[in-house]
């Protein structure tokens, strides 16, 4: 008899797992509480402006292409992606700008401010990150290793310690090789992909730089939601039954084994395996009602990553100095990280990510106008949450900073505005305390590891998404879905012997 898989949540991890399980011959039902597939890969359109509500950067497209190749299809027949050789522009408080290009040579050619020594150091750092990327690819990505003990067993103790560089934090690894203060800050902020602090995260995450340099940075034409739409279409073609607007209220268990789910309609649906794309702690807390003692233990080890104050602005002008992707850096990177990740306050001088897709895709705003998305990282929802007044003051701080750093009269030109706070993120995606990137990567607390993909408490329960390994970011959550499918397939193959 064909075994039945239930997938809770249609984020990229969930839809990826559903596709791979269907391709492997299982009966698959996916339940998504929202009316769209893609999770945080969401879309907002108003007054002629289009915005990606969630991620705006596509990297490692081969991870997505593999899903189509398993079905002997081509992703290019479903969605169009465009490589961006100019990866982003960095603005600094003293007026300095640095353009990051794909390739160290190209970056040097486009930045007269960078010396020969700067370029040599940047190349040296790239070589270092390449070594880390290569070894993580062998075990962490290809085999879905979930814990430090598994890493050590796979690579050997000395090899793992040296090549994963567990001795240093990410910022220490950067500062050891880079002397230019602007490059130090820019490279440190690659940690944005996982919503953590480069001063706390392990050096292994330095691989993010090589990943982007080697695999490129891409734009999904028309908006990144088209990628989710493509995966949804593939899933339906493979026979996945997708239920949108369908909320799972409870996971049923019997003798430490999951047996099915109860929907908000009261209907019970039986399952042989359950894959939750809901974050791990909210799954245990709200769907299984795990005891307080075990929940508290998990929360101590796995603290939520950062959230964000997300502004979607339609402006009645154009700012020629902006690139597609931009960063407006803080005066004091260490203080910014401290305030967000340790003091848990809204930062005084945040680093701001600003994306302006209209620079590449003119369909995203009316002629002569621009669509600007603004995202500074802020703490996840605290026991004493920030107030509406707190957010209003923070909004003014953001706009003051952007105007001061070159976006003249930005306030006057705003004709459309939509804002998402951590509370909105929590409400729409059931994310843990409104975190965007799952759990924080911390060298001391968790060595940069997230939750294992297989439940330690209940048989036949698996997790995908940003709260499990290999981590946050759209390629990683998509890969987590494929890795879970591999684990279930391997388990079933073993059971048949």
Curated annotation (Swiss-Prot):
SUPFAM superfamilies, per database record: FAD/NAD(P)-binding domain
UniProt GO molecular function: oxidoreductase activity
Residues given in the record as FAD binding sites: 7-19
EC number(s) given by UniProt: 1.14.99.-
Keyword Membrane: no
Pathway: Carotenoid biosynthesis; staphyloxanthin biosynthesis; staphyloxanthin from farnesyl diphosphate: step 3/5
Reaction equation(s) it catalyzes: all-trans-4,4'-diaponeurosporene + 2 AH2 + 2 O2 = 4,4'-diaponeurosporenal + 2 A + 3 H2O
Cited InterPro entries: Amino_oxidase (IPR002937), Carotenoid/retinoid_OxRdtase (IPR014105), FAD/NAD-bd_sf (IPR036188)
Family: Belongs to the carotenoid/retinoid oxidoreductase family. CrtP subfamily.
Protein name (Swiss-Prot/TrEMBL): 4,4'-diaponeurosporene oxygenase
Source organism (scientific name): Staphylococcus aureus (strain MW2)
UniProt lineage: Bacteria, Bacillati, Bacillota, Bacilli, Bacillales
């Amino acid at each position: 008899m064909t075994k039945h898989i239930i997938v809770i949540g249609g984020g990229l991890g969930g839809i990826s797992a559903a596709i791979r399980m269907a391709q492997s011959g299982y009966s698959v039902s996916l339940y998504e509480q929202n009316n769209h597939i893609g999770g945080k890969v969401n879309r907002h359109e108003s007054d002629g402006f289009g915005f990606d509500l969630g991620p705006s950067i596509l990297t490692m497209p081969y991870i997505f292409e593999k899903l189509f190749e398993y079905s002997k299809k081509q992703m290019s027949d479903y969605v169009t992606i465009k490589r961006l050789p100019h990866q982003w522009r960095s603005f600094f408080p003293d007026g300095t700008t640095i353009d990051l290009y794909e390739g160290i040579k190209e970056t040097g050619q486009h930045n007269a401010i960078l010396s020969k020594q700067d370029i040599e150091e940047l190349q040296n750092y790239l070589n270092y990150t390449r070594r880390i990327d290569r070894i993580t690819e062998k075990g962490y990505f290809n085999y879905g290793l979930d814990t430090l003990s598994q890493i050590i067993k796979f690579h050997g103790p000395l090899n793992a310690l040296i090549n994963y560089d567990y001795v240093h934090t990410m910022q220490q690894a950067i500062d050891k090789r880079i002397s230019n203060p602007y490059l130090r800050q820019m490279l440190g902020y690659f940690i944005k992909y996982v919503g953590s602090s480069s001063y706390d995260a392990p050096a292994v995450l330095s691989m993010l730089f090589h990943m982007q340099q080697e695999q490129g940075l891409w734009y999904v034409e028309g908006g990144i939601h088209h990628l989710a739409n493509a995966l949804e279409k593939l899933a339906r073609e493979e026979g996945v039954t997708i239920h949108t607007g369908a909320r799972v209220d409870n996971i049923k268990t019997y003798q430490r084994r999951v047996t099915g789910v109860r929907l908000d309609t009261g209907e019970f649906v039986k399952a042989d395996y359950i894959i939750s794309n809901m974050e791990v702690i909210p799954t245990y807390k709200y769907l299984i009602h795990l005891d307080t003692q075990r929940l508290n233990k998990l929360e101590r080890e796995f603290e939520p990553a950062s959230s964000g104050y997300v502004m979607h602005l339609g402006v009645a002008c154009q700012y020629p100095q902006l690139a597609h992707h931009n960063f407006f850096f803080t005066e004091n990177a260490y203080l910014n990280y401290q305030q967000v990740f340790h003091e848990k306050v809204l930062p005084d001088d945040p680093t701001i990510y600003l994306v302006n897709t209209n620079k590449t895709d003119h369909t995203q705003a009316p002629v002569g106008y621009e669509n600007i998305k603004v995202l500074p990282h802020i703490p996840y929802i605290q026991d004493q949450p920030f107030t509406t007044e707190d957010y209003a003051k923070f909004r003014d701080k953001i706009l003051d900073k952007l105007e001061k750093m070159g976006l003249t009269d930005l306030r006057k030109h705003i004709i459309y505005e939509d804002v998402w706070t951590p509370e909105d993120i929590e409400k729409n995606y059931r994310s843990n305390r409104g975190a965007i990137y799952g759990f924080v990567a911390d060298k001391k607390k968790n060595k940069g590891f997230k939750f294992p993909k297989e439940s330690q408490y209940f048989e036949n329960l698996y997790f995908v998404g940003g709260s499990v390994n290999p981590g946050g970011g759209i390629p990683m959550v998509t890969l987590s879905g494929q890795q879970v499918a591999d684990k279930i397939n391997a388990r079933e193959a073993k059971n048949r012997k």
